[in-house]
Amino acid sequence: MPRTFRNPILPGFYPDPSICRVGDDYYLVNSTFEYFPGLPIFHSRDLVHWRQLGHILDRPSQLPLDGVYASGGLYAPTIRYNRGTFYVINTLVGGTSKSGNFIVTATDPAGPWSEPYWLENAPGIDPSLFFDDDGRAWYVGNRMATDSRYDGHTEIWLQELDLAAMCLVGEPCVLWEGAARDAVWAEAPHLYKINGQYYLMIAEGGTSHDHAVTIARSGEITGPYKANRRNPIITHRHLGQDYQIVGTGHADLVETQFGEWWMVLLAMRPYGGYFYNLGRETFLVPLRWEEGWPVVAPGSGRVALAERTPDLPEQRWPAVPACDHFETQTLAPHWNFLRTPRDDFWSLCARPGYLRLRLRPERLTDLANPSFVGRRQQHMRFSARAALEFRPQHDDECAGLVLVQNNEFHIRFVITGGATPTVHLVKRSTPESNPQLMPIIPGTDVTLAELPIEGSRFYFKVEADGQAYSFYIATEPESWHPVAEGVDGRILSTPYAGGFVGTYIGMYASSNGQPSTNSADFDWFEYLGLDEN
C-alpha cells in the first residue's frame, strides 16, 4: 500500500501559501493580516512535515501595523529564490503610516530579513516575482481593471523589476483578466517557465466558496496568453456547501528534485454548518502534465483529506510541546500579537518561568495593540488550559483567556477586579451573521456568565467539540467548576463575522481605558488538539 498523509499540511489559519525549493529543501510562507510577527516561514524536506523557522517580518521597523483594521495588514506573500538570495514580496493593506507592495530579502531563510524595499507605482495586491533564465526579473500582480465594467473586475499585470535599484522599470502590460467570462477577482498570479513556455496561474472567483485556480500560457512573457480550455484546473465550488473541503484556490506550484509536481493551495473545512472557525488552511495536492497543461489531483480532480505521499524521503521534525512553561528567553514562533507592539507590555524575564502581561488601557475591542499573546486554533476539537496569577486592583482590570476572530467578534473569559474578584464570560458579536466578508460589522457585549471567585491563582480551561465551546475555572489543579458549557462558537467563523482570518486563542490583560500599574502572570499555557477521526 502506498504511504498517505492527511490534509491540511498546515491546519488552522495559514492562508495564501507560497512555496519554493532550494536543492532538497522546501520553504513556505503564508498571509498573516493584522497579526505580528508577520509571514511565518516553514521548512520541509518531504512536503508533508513542516517546522516553523520563524517569521519574515519580526521587527517593528519592518511591519507598521499600527491602527490597521481587522483583516487589513499583510496579504498574500510570494517566496522565491534566485542566485543565492531569498525574496519575499508582499502587500500591506490599510496601513496608517505606510501601505503598498514591498520586497524583503535574506540569504538565510531563517533570517534576518532585510528592511522593506517599498515599490512605487505598483498598485493592487497579491504580487509575485519571476526570475527568467536570461537574468531578468519581473513583477506580476493584480489591480482593478483599467476599463472596469463590474464589481470585482480585476486584471493581471506585469512589469520588469530592477533588482539592483529595487524599482519597477519599463512599461507595464496587462496579461489576463481570468478564464471565466466576467470573472471576478482575478488575483494570486504566479509565473512559471516550463519547457520554453510561460505559464500564468491565478485564482479567480473570490476567496470564499467560489474560489478556483485557472491557468494560461504564452511563448512570450508579455503574452498574449491563451487560456487552458479545461479551466478551472481545480475548484470545489460545484460540490456544494456540505462538502468536507470548500473554497479551494490561491495556489502555487513546486517541482521536486525527482521531477514530481505538487500544488499548495488554501481551502476551508466547514463544520457545524457552513462555518470554518479554523480559517483558510494550507493543503497539498499532486499534479502532472498532460499535453502541455497541468492536471491537478489526477483521477479525482479534488483536494482530498487523505492523499498519497510525495516520492521524497520522509523527514519528521521534533514535535512542538503541547504545554509552554515560558522558561525560554523568547516566545515560541507560534505565538502572535495583534498589530505592531510599540512598548514592552510582555516579559519572560520580569518573573522567570512566567509570561507577564502588563495591564494597559487598550482593549480587545480597539483597533490597537492590546496586551494579548495568542496562537491559532488548529483543531475542531481541542482543549486549552492555562494557569494565571493575578490580583485585580480595580473594577476595570481584567486578565484571562480570549477566543478571537476580530475586535468585534470574540469571547473573553477573564477575572475582573474590585473587592471581590469575579469570573466573567463575555461574548462580543452581532445578533445576525455578516453576509459580506468586509467590512466588519460592529458588535456588542453580552455577558454569558459571571460568578465570584476567591484567591489569586486561577486555572482556566476551554474545550471545543465542534461549534460547542465550554469554559471551566479552578483555584486548585483539576478541580474544575463549569462556567458555561456548549457556548455557540459560530461567531468565531468568517461566514458569520466577516474578514479573512481564523480563530486565535490566547492570554489577555487590560485595564479597559484606565491607567494601571498592575500585571498578570501566566505560569503556563497548554493547547492540545483532540482526535477528529
Predicted regions and their residues:
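Carbohydrate-active catalytic/glycan-binding domains of CAZyme proteins
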Residues: 1-533
